[in-house]
């Protein structure tokens, strides 16, 4: 048994599961599968924008004052994960549309070698928003495939209604 640290969230873990399945179907040995999946995890990039910052405030990732000011001014942080898997702020914008545009631009800037990657998007009760993000991204980057899923379990609690998570 081997336990992977996804260093991602939501649909990032889905992509890791798909990579494990791909290795299994290719007949890889256990050690080769572990090595391949670890390299895959290192190559993943996770981005997200949340409609509501309450959960980040409640779990201590955002101070009450910052949360209050951001909510009052309609500031939406563009978030991502570090190579170690911790959450970091990549930028911010006023309003969800601008924050999503900033996230898409960030992904396009960083996503140079994406033709062999899968673009995966998860959303919390906002399928139209997810489809729009996918459409804009696919105009800017070339990927092997893309898909959209609903958030589930703990990811739904963290994303809150309106949250979008993108993993590439």
Residue positions per predicted region:
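Mixed-charge interfacial surface used for oligomerization/domain docking
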Residues: 1-2, 8-168
């Amino acid at each position: 048994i081997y336990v992977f640290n996804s260093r991602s969230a939501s649909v990032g873990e889905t992509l890791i599961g798909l990579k494990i399945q791909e290795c299994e179907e290719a007949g890889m040995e256990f050690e080769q599968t572990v090595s391949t999946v670890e390299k895959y995890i290192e190559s993943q990039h996770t981005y997200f924008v949340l409609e509501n910052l309450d959960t980040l405030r409640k779990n201590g990732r955002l101070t009450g004052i910052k949360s209050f000011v951001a909510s009052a001014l309609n500031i939406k942080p563009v978030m991502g994960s570090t190579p170690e898997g911790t959450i970091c702020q990549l930028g911010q914008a006023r309003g969800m549309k601008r924050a999503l545009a900033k996230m898409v631009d960030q992904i396009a800037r960083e996503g140079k070698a994406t033709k062999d990657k899968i673009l995966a998007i998860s959303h919390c009760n906002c399928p139209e928003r997810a489809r729009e993000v996918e459409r804009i991204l696919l105009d800017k980057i070339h990927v092997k495939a893309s898909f959209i899923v609903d958030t589930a379990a703990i990811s739904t609690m963290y994303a809150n209604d309106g949250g979008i998570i993108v993993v590439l």
